[in-house]
Amino acid sequence: MFNKVKVACLILLLGFQGVANAALEIVITEGIDGARPIAIVPFKYQGIGPIPQKISEVIAADLMRSGKFKPVDVAQMPQQPSKDSDINYASWVNKGVEAILVGEVEQQSNGRYLVRYELVDVIRGQITGGQTQMMTNGKLIKNQDHILEARESIISDTGFRRYSHRISDVIYEKLTGEKGAFLTKIAYVIVRDNDDRPYQLVVSDYDGFNEQVLLRSKEPLMSPAWSPDGTKLAYVTFENRQSQIYIQDLYSGKRELVTSYPGINGAPQFSPDGKKLLLVLSKDKTGATEVYLLDLVTRKETRLTRHRSIDTEPSWHPNGQDIVFTSERGGNAQIYKLNLKTGRTQRLSFDGDMNLAGSITPDGKELVMVNRTNGQYHLAKKELATGAFQVLTRTRLDESPSIAPNGSMIIYSTLHNNKQVLALVSMDGRFKARLPVLDGQVKAPAWSPYLQ
């Protein structure tokens, strides 16, 4: 019934302390009819004073955003058990629930907390009454195989959100067989016109919490892109009155100038092995905008496209052998694939009037893009094997889609009330939410890889 795969969730700390409050605040805009019901019961708390963070609320929000789960409203829960032995399996099965998370938080000394939790298959629990027996070395041993996961950990008072995301990852993988992406981060650009340095390069948790400003500038910042190990960001800056590409180390804050040619220096994208960088330059004599490949070790540049039309917005196929890019060589902007070994180019997009900002999902099966049809710019996806096409959003002037490393969600920039905001959509289009910044406009989101 459930894929019982062990999970190892490791966390990368970016070398700076974060604040818990969010500059981005999630607003749900569309529900998740058809998703799997799941119960995330509020954890029982034993301690003096309020609990630093309600773990169950963070987990329920994580799972709902994936589009695959529909957490039961607390007010609709038939009971609120804190451990498996307290669960009335039949009452949950009658509500259509397949799995339930229960747990406890116990305050320790010196700002530490003991957290215990169990993920329970309530259907299996109802069938077996919570106890089964199996033969081991000729002996009949009692087994509780309806408990899919049981863990306990000591965490600090500042670690509740991070640990909640870790539990979400465990649940997601146990119930889907796919790795969760709730411990990841996003990078984006905030523009605050009233600030002395209005352009800010920011990194936060994927849900907008623990925001950290990496760079403030008087000139525009664009196109942040993560290295595959999650330790660096490449981005475009106009600090010296022309476009330049930098790579910045997230641990030390040190940054390195990569290109600063006259004309366009843009759209950096790290290769899957982190050794190369795709970028867009207009440095040749004709001023043509073309896609280049930069070897970060040897600094050798290789021109990949040669066409009189604009070639831009490159991204890597997960196989590391192909790239996709946007080109106007067919008249309107469309998405093409280029094989790095053969140089063969193939058009991938045909639906609507034009298609932009293409990227391939981590499993290599789908193309995500911005599609323009009848003057409307929406996120869409196409199955590469069948050609099946689906529009995912109904927001305005969508741009800059970035896919979660497990392929479950997409973050993008859109227009809401004439203001640029970030938005989330699940890969199946069932769940949608806005992440409006409290001050300023937000654009150019980039989802991190898994953080190890």
UniProtKB/Swiss-Prot annotation:
First and last residue of the signal peptide: 1-22
Record Gene3D superfamilies: TolB, C-terminal domain, TolB, N-terminal domain
A cellular-component GO term for this protein: periplasmic space
Keyword presence, Signal: yes
Record key words, sorted: Cell cycle, Cell division, Periplasm, Signal
Gene Ontology biological-process annotations: cell division; protein import
Protein function: Part of the Tol-Pal system, which plays a role in outer membrane invagination during cell division and is important for maintaining outer membrane integrity.
Stated name of the protein: Tol-Pal system protein TolB
Organism lineage: Bacteria, Pseudomonadati, Pseudomonadota, Gammaproteobacteria, Alteromonadales
Gene that produces this protein: tolB
